């Protein structure tokens, strides 16, 4: 349906309005394409069944509790009535001197989103470091809403392509679904493995990352070589 905006802002020129209307048409096309891609994602057939019920370590819900260590299974991450699990692979391996700044920036925002997301799905963050080290970092960041897991004693990261053969960590978000008492892989952000366009990185989770979406609205954009840091 043909549609034209009647909105006008103070002092805008005819050139501005013509360019903005063209951009608005492109934004509407993008909005439609985003939904079309989301529909394709929703219609994916079931992926492979979980090869094993991976065991993880986690601490108490209260990050101030530094003594409690709980051992559980991936199946335990599913709550009653919620049959989808999103599991983010946090690049913080035992050989890394510090956590990945990019992952950290993403998780800073996900921590705020988590209480809302929890109404619709199960959400957790997994890293290869020992659970005590993961929680210490989370305390320093002020994360209070993320369920943090250590995969130090299992092969989850390797099996689901969040770890290289040399032990390097990759920032993959994977989704699993529970069907009839079994757990299946549903989706992973495989765009992280695809070649990036010139002047870009893989942008595999950018749709979920407020920082980049905000910067994309600005005349300056993201910047050619700017990336989040652990501190400023």
Describe the function of each predicted region.
Residues 114-133, 144-155:
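Thiol-based oxidoreductase modules, predominantly thioredoxin-like and allied folds used
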Residues 1-85, 90-115, 119, 137-140, ...:
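Non-globular targeting/processing and membrane-anchoring segments
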